[in-house]
């Protein structure tokens, strides 16, 4: 029997669970308990407040949705790891601390890198996986040398310029997205520290380094059904990486969204939610 919980993400209370490694992980939970939970893993230098309420509420309409802060990010304790593999280990520890053995997992940007790592190293943990705006280890144009934590000093400009294209329609969607992020009036998350963002930047740069052999070998070990969602004009993670994921994963389908950059799922929320819910309910 599904147990009703909080119905909107903007009102979801923050909670903390202590993982086996002693780290206190901050999380929020919204939707109906009962079936396989959907866990959302966020992008670079983002905390729980940076999830689009429109997306979370749409996904939580008929399922249990969980967001969380990575180690050392936002309200979570510990020191932010400097590799994606270490982040993945901590995420698995968080899931175990909640008593979860199998989940659906949506990874956005950095979260998609973490998702691939967990799907490969702990395949029993994931039933289905959604990868938004991300790329494979050693992907094309994924050195992230153009990224700087100094850009975080102007988050509005950063989001409008990197998550949305210059078109009028995309920029309008960007401003609507920013308005939605400000809906939460109380119990806001702790801002991300620059030291934590710097460690996270080292992690994604390490992920983007091209290995000396077997560039996409890890993808062949991932067998969970996967939905790949990408903006056709993504300037953060080039869209060619979505096609590489589709070609190398064992069971993948690609949703490429037009006139969209890194925040494609928020710009085309209706299309994204329809496809994501159909995929998760399959």
State where each predicted segment sits:
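Short beta-strand/loop motif that positions the catalytic acidic residue
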Residues: 222, 228-230
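Conserved HGGG/HGGXW glycine-rich cap/lid loop of the alpha/beta-hydrolase fold
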Residues: 20-77
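Flexible "cap/lid" loop of the alpha/beta hydrolase fold
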Residues: 116, 120, 127-158
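Active-site loop/oxyanion-hole signature of alpha/beta-hydrolase fold enzymes
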Residues: 66-106, 274
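Gly/Ala-rich beta-loop-alpha elbow adjacent to hydrolase catalytic centers
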Residues: 107, 111, 115
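Conserved alpha/beta-hydrolase "acid-adjacent" motif
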Residues: 235-241
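Hydrophobic, aromatic-rich cap/lid helix
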Residues: 13, 188-215
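Catalytic active-site module of serine/aspartate enzymes centered on a nucleophile-bearing elbow/loop
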Residues: 251-282
């Amino acid at each position: 029997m599904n147990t009703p919980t909080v119905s909107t993400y903007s009102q979801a209370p923050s909670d903390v669970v202590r993982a086996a490694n002693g780290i206190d992980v901050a999380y929020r939970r919204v939707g109906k308990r009962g079936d396989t939970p959907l866990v959302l893993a966020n992008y670079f230098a983002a905390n729980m407040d940076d999830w689009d309420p429109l997306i979370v509420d749409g996904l939580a309409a008929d399922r249990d949705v969980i967001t969380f802060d990575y180690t050392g990010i936002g309200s979570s304790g510990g020191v932010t790891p400097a590799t994606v593999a270490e982040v993945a280990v901590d995420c698995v520890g968080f899931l175990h601390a909640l008593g979860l053995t199998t989940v659906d997992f949506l990874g956005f940007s950095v979260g998609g890198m973490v998702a691939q790592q967990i799907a490969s190293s702990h395949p029993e943990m994931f039933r289905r996986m959604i990868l938004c705006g991300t790329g494979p280890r050693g992907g094309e144009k994924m050195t992230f040398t153009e990224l700087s934590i100094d850009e975080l000093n102007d988050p509005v400009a950063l989001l409008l310029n990197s998550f949305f294209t210059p078109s009028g329609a995309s920029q309008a969607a960007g401003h609507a997205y920013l308005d939605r992020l400000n809906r939460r009036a109380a119990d806001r998350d702790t801002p991300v520290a620059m030291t934590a963002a710097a460690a996270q930047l080292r992690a994604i740069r390490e992920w983007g380094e091209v290995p000396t052999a077997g560039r996409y070998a890890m993808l062949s070990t991932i067998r969970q059904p996967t939905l790949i969602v990408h903006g056709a004009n993504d300037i953060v993670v080039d869209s060619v990486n979505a096609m590489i994921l589709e070609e190398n994963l064992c069971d993948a389908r690609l949703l490429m969204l037009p006139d969209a950059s890194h925040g494609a799922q928020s710009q085309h929320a209706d299309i994204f939610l329809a496809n994501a819910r159909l995929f998760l309910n399959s």
